[in-house]
């Protein structure tokens, strides 16, 4: 059987970033920049005050005969406006935070270091000498014209949104979101709103995968369930090929009714269909026509784990990401992993930072049908191939799915 690493490499070799498009800034969150972003002007575009206070010449703040200098207040400037006159020797202007520094002034003293008879007084005493540039934010201090601010391939988060807005990008060049078809298979599968009947199970996988696809940044399309007939699968695949990626659950094992691989071979190709891992050995990859297809196992835990290992990196590459994989950390496994499994074993666990190290505890029964083992899981402990056991208190690698708050 193929290793996890080889399977992932073969899958990703067939995946390309999708075409670029322009989206409104308000819709760019989570997408990937399709070009470098270069500042077209200085930010801030003008020198402005970092404090409420007075704009003056720094030399006018020096004491005179041991006494605080007294300056005439000739006006004021608020944020959003410009001064209608210059500051000259012996004069000053009131200034608000963010307001442009008036011509002639080379420093700003905060109001707390001044003294006036009343807020509207025409005279102010300067109680402390201040150097040139004090409390002034120079034009271009944050970004200067011609500077590359964001790089192609950067993911757009809330802070990037703020920077793009500051630079005036109302529409943003991005790699477009993938549209992903999600298809359940099997005569035994019914929808979630149907009453359970003997021999039937609810279509939990399609809803789980829909949510996982959305969290990965793509747009999911649930296509329902294909029955265990060639005709039903062909009909569903005809609908699915309008999308960028097809993800199925079930139908890729070795049973008489596991037909997905056969239809893949008929309408496209099968690259591989078994991986040396648990849970999730029966994973298939290939295509229907020119659309890549990732066939995940029918057991819900297997579908969830294999999506994290293979489906999520595929979507991230389609989105234009260059960092595709979840991070791994070294953990101490408090309760150990005693089951001997010859395949690579991904054990559901909860990892937290405790006493200067990452500590992991497994989430109970690790059967591939035990969906409750996915609850309170934020990591997968990686147990190497070959029947390796991890003793209680032993060390292992863990693939982090989320980072717990502290």
Q: What do the PLM-derived regions correspond to, one by one?
A:
Residues 1-5, 170-296, 300-306:
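Helix-rich terminal scaffold detector
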Residues 1-65, 94, 138, 316, ...:
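Short, low-complexity N-terminal leaders and the immediately following helix N-cap/first helix
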Residues 21-26, 30, 35, 80, ...:
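Flexible glycine/proline-rich
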Residues 47-49, 62-66, 84-88, 101-103, ...:
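Solvent-exposed alpha-helices and their adjacent loops that cap or buttress functional pockets
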Residues 1-4, 8, 21, 25, ...:
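Generic structural signal for well-ordered, non-membrane alpha-helical segments
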Residues 12-19, 36, 147, 153, ...:
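Structural signal for hydrophobic packing residues in well-ordered secondary-structure cores
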Residues 2, 55-222, 359-360, 364, ...:
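Short, glycine/charged-enriched hinge/interface segments at domain edges or termini
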